[in-house]
Amino acid sequence: MLLELARWLQQLESLFGLFNYLTFRGILAALTALFLSLWMGPAVIRKLAQFKGGQPIRQDGPQTHFSKAGTPTMGGSLILLTVTLSVLLWGDLRNRYVWLVLAVMICFGAIGWYDDWIKIVRRDPNGLKSRWKYLLQSIFGLAAGLFLYYTADVPAAITFYIPMFKSIALPLVGVSFVVIAYFWIVGFSNAVNLTDGLDGLAIMPTVLVACALGVFAYASGNVVFAEYLKIPLIPGAGELIIICSAIAGAGLGFLWFNTYPAMVFMGDIGALSLGAVLGTIAVIVRQEMVLVIMGGVFVIETLSVIIQVASFKLTGKRVFRMAPIHHHFELKGWPEPRVIVRFWIISVVLVLIGLATLKVR
């Protein structure tokens, strides 16, 4: 929105040419989302509290969690609102990737909103039935995959790459591309949701991964950097740095209220949408495997649930005291802040490893 105005004003004053720089607009997007979150946060929390929007607590969960009963949830609505406003202000609205990612965020956010609403109204910790949730996620995930496949304008946009091995490039045709896109979008949507079980646990890794994906997006959309780093050149992908920056800013603003002890929970409206956005951006910039590395905390949390369920069904025994794995450490006696910060540290290390793949080719 403001980019178009700046382009017109540039004819009168060259200073407005700054808005043509992705990095400059990325910084503005992050700051806008951050300050909007800090400004709007208290009002949103008060409104959620008035709606009795408290998160139901698992009865079989750690005893320390019962003190969280009544804490407002659906705080992810603050993230979605501030990200959307920031992107509309500073993004290039002629870019199809911007609209796709916003659409994915809103659609998955709508699923999360309905899930949260059921939990609040019916006081049911399980929320929306899994089959309906996965059906809706599948519809939106497949739609995003089909859109990316049929709008791809360069071969690199539908090629699967393995990090650190520049010679390995697997062209994807039709169904194979859509299936991979589907699994990454829906998979990371649910992975972030599973991770969101402690105060601030999910949002900080999300911020870190978003920042790193912004670096990949910027490089992938730049001819010089893409050639130098030997990564796929995806025209238009650089604009995704605006969305990544907005997520980082909004995420930090939300963490101000979500840090231990949390004043508000993100809820499925935030977790499902942010995870889907990370997966979508990774698919666009062709860094699916790098996302698996950088989002390793989300992957580990998901695997812990899969292992726990499979083990119990096959042997009748549990591998962990409770899944997802962050609850396992809580039941081992780790204080909640220790679990959170240690998972953050792991996330920082994994993101740095992911960024290192830019040079290791």
Swiss-Prot record:
Pathway(s) the chain acts in: Cell wall biogenesis; peptidoglycan biosynthesis
Signal peptide: none
E.C. numbers: 2.7.8.13
Molecular functions per Gene Ontology: metal ion binding; phospho-N-acetylmuramoyl-pentapeptide-transferase activity; UDP-N-acetylmuramoyl-L-alanyl-D-glutamyl-meso-2,6-diaminopimelyl-D-alanyl-D-alanine:undecaprenyl-phosphate transferase activity
Membrane-crossing residue ranges in chain numbering: 25-45, 73-93, 98-118, 139-159, 168-188, 200-220, 237-257, 264-284, 289-309, 339-359
Pfam families the record matches: Glycos_transf_4
Entry keyword annotation includes Transcription regulation: no
Keyword Transmembrane: yes
Catalytic activity: UDP-N-acetyl-alpha-D-muramoyl-L-alanyl-gamma-D-glutamyl-meso-2,6-diaminopimeloyl-D-alanyl-D-alanine + di-trans,octa-cis-undecaprenyl phosphate = di-trans,octa-cis-undecaprenyl diphospho-N-acetyl-alpha-D-muramoyl-L-alanyl-D-glutamyl-meso-2,6-diaminopimeloyl-D-alanyl-D-alanine + UMP
Cross-referenced InterPro entries: Glycosyl_transferase_4, PNAcMuramoyl-5peptid_Trfase, PNAcMuramoyl-5peptid_Trfase_CS
Keyword terms: Cell cycle, Cell division, Cell inner membrane, Cell membrane, Cell shape, Cell wall biogenesis/degradation, Magnesium, Membrane, Metal-binding, Peptidoglycan synthesis, Transferase, Transmembrane, Transmembrane helix
Cofactor(s) needed for function: Mg(2+)
Entry's family note: Belongs to the glycosyltransferase 4 family. MraY subfamily.
Functional description taken from the UniProt entry: Catalyzes the initial step of the lipid cycle reactions in the biosynthesis of the cell wall peptidoglycan: transfers peptidoglycan precursor phospho-MurNAc-pentapeptide from UDP-MurNAc-pentapeptide onto the lipid carrier undecaprenyl phosphate, yielding undecaprenyl-pyrophosphoryl-MurNAc-pentapeptide, known as lipid I.
Protein name: Phospho-N-acetylmuramoyl-pentapeptide-transferase
Organism: Xanthomonas oryzae pv. oryzae (strain KACC10331 / KXO85)
